[in-house]
A protein has these predicted regions:
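A structural detector for beta-sheet-dominated domains
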Residues: 52-54, 73-75, 89, 114, ...
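General beta-strand recognition
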Residues: 57-59, 87, 118
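Residue-level signal for mature regions of secreted extracellular proteins and peptides
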Residues: 15-16, 126
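Exported/periplasmic cell-wall-interacting domains
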Residues: 22, 27-29, 80-85, 92-203
Length: 203
């Protein structure tokens, strides 16, 4: 089971700005080259998380304002990520897997939206590959954790209108060939250190 960090792209407001240095968003990068910008909401009560499972695009919106747009990794066939309308009802930054296999494996920045389903840090593949949870690169997971709170609504559908308006700007990410860190690193408390720099920026 692979779980690590990543990069991202992003944009906001009336004019969408790509902040990853990739003008088209079509190039695929590995985990080491992934960096994300997320905008601080004006009204946190208006934040909503939207996930398109067919494209694996994740958008964080404040009304019509885009705060963050990144690639996620959703459930594989036979272990699909649930669709529908949910709310974040539990957050835990330093969460670890409690069952075997891989007991103790970090699931940092856990944001639970349904029983046993949540957003968390992990290796992001270009195809659905999880057991139903939604994995995000560390760069994205830390910022999602900062953007949402208990009660933040979540919408998960096979496709979303935002796929057409913002989807082309999502930087594609492929960590399927990235090596797993040593287990000693995964089990270290230092694993839960935030990525460098501010998690949210003003626009």
């Amino acid at each position: 089971m692979r779980q690590v960090s990543g990069l991202i792209l992003l944009a906001a407001g009336g004019s969408v700005l790509l902040l990853t240095g990739c003008a088209t968003g079509k190039a695929t990068v590995g985990g080491g080259n992934y960096h994300v910008t997320a905008y601080r909401p004006h009204d946190p009560s208006q934040v909503k998380v939207k996930l398109s499972t067919s494209t694996q695009n994740l958008f964080v919106m404040e009304g019509d304002r885009l705060l963050m747009a990144v690639q996620a990794n959703v459930g594989k066939p036979g272990a699909l990520t649930p669709h529908g309308h949910f709310t974040i009802y539990s957050k835990q930054k330093e969460r670890r897997r409690a069952s075997e296999p891989d007991r103790g494996y970090p699931m940092a920045y856990w944001c639970e939206f349904a029983p046993a389903y949540g957003f968390h840090e992990g290796f992001v593949w270009p195809v659905p590959h999880t057991h139903g949870c939604v994995r995000l690169h560390r760069e994205a997971a830390a910022r999602l954790f900062a953007l949402v709170r208990v009660g933040t609504p979540v919408e998960i559908e096979s496709s979303l209108p935002e796929d057409a308006t913002y989807g082309r700007m999502v930087q594609r990410l492929d960590q399927s060939r990235d090596p797993d860190p040593p287990r000693s690193v995964l089990l270290s408390p230092s694993w839960f250190k935030d990525p460098p720099g501010p998690l949210l920026v003003d626009q």
